[in-house]
Amino acid sequence: MRKILLSFITISFIVGCNQNNSKQNQTKVADEVTYGKPQLNEKSASYLYHFAFDCIDQEYPNKLGQVLGNATYLKEPSELHPAFYGCFDWHSSVHGHWTLLNIVKDLPNFEYREAVFQKLQKSITKENILKEVQYFDDVHNKSFERTYGWAWLLKVAETLQDWNTEEATKMYENLEPLVELVENKYMEFLPKLKYPIRVGEHPNTAFGMSFALDYAKKYSPELENIIIEKAKEYYMNDKGCPINWEPGGFDFLSPCLQEASLMLKVLPNEEYVSWLDTFLPNFRNNPSQYLNVTEVTDRSDGKLAHLDGLNFSRAWCLYEIGNILQNDKMVNLANKHFEYSYKKMDSGEYAGAHWLASFALYAVLKSN
């Protein structure tokens, strides 16, 4: 009886070991799958462009995010925001413009180039932008689109100033009063923000600072200094970011990766690697252990559709970090995230169609 029991225990141990080895091998095989890197070409541009092109002058449905001072504030979206009234909300309209600008900037022979310019030149006019400035100056709406929409507006400004063409120069001249206003709003707000906002949606401080820093490094030294100073104040001593808690059900940004992306732009490479290993221990060695693609259960639900955006924003952060650190595992994980949601964007649901092309394009541009 004793021999039988020992034999049973031995067999059970061997079977258990074999099962564990099988699981480990399966994980290893999954990790070794190589995903293709996205490219901006005529095909991908034509796919992405129509999302933004179709919505930047689509006025309804519309989410205004407005504070009413009295009954006279009740106006049509196109009256309140003559430049950026489409694509459901102000910030999506702004980054819809960014999407179209970057497609025609990077692909000079793009098939729909002239149609894009005609549409953009109707919205980014001097008169329209001055009305946008007036809205931001209203006593009841001074924090409008803080800081998410501000960040995307500076992305538009960055593109126009980087792009040395007659059309871009003219559009930037028209946009400049709003750009200056947003710069000043950043410089007024960040010194007063005692604690960073660490959520996976619009108010995320690291996202707002990261995009603004890209612009400021080229065109606004004063804003650059403020952002770098505040980034170190907020994030330099952070340790062990709980990335295993992510994602939240409505997230379109990764709080941990947005912070890691920002600090990549703030710290020298050697110092950054040390910071990253403290902030996200072992992440460089095995990023797929901590992140997998997020799945969307209902693309008609605007909040649940955020998770497609999360796949794209994770991808661009992983590209930024992985390319600088020459980390192929991060880049491959970025490719995996991108591929999953890119194939599902054209669902026919406006909940995602009004904004996801910008996130997808930004990831594509960061992949190279």
Give the predicted meaning of each segment.
Residues 28-85, 349:
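Low-complexity, Ser/Thr/Pro/Gly-enriched N-terminal "stalk/linker" regions
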Residues 36-42, 77-94, 135-151, 192-205, ...:
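Solvent-exposed loop and edge beta-strand segments that line ligand/cofactor-binding
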Residues 292-368:
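Fungal-biased detection of long, low-complexity, Ser/Thr-
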